[in-house]
Amino acid sequence: DALAPFRVATPTHDTPILSYLQETGDKNFDIQLEVAIQPQGQAETVICHSNTKYLYWSAAQQLAHHTVNGCNSRIGDVYASGTISGKEKNTFGSMLELTWRGTQPLKMTDGTERKFLQDNDTVIMRGYAEKDGVRIGFGEVVGQVLPAL
């Protein structure tokens, strides 16, 4: 219910889809996403601003596809949507896309560059929906890349 005002249409599908995946109406959500990298002991650099409205498949379609072959899904299960990328470079959802396979490094706030994540980098993901002065925040997901043993 809380996200109802943030519903948006899914992108148009390039090819016909199976009947169990067909749906009508606004099934995606307009949720702003932000990803930052924070090198150890340094300030963070925001590297991506994306949005769940770019998801090619809605959450309902993803769940239907996941379970259609008999794979159970229960309360508390977690599944990943995959990379959420827009069409502009700053909306690309992976380091591989953002750096064009490591050929175009990202400039960090501290002046260093990143082609890929490095040991001790912290990745921070944030999400929120905002419309007409109403903001629903989802907080942060934070993880640090630890060196191999």
Show where each model-derived region lies.
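Catalytic-core "active-site belt" of small-molecule-metabolizing enzymes
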Residues: D1-R74, I84-L149
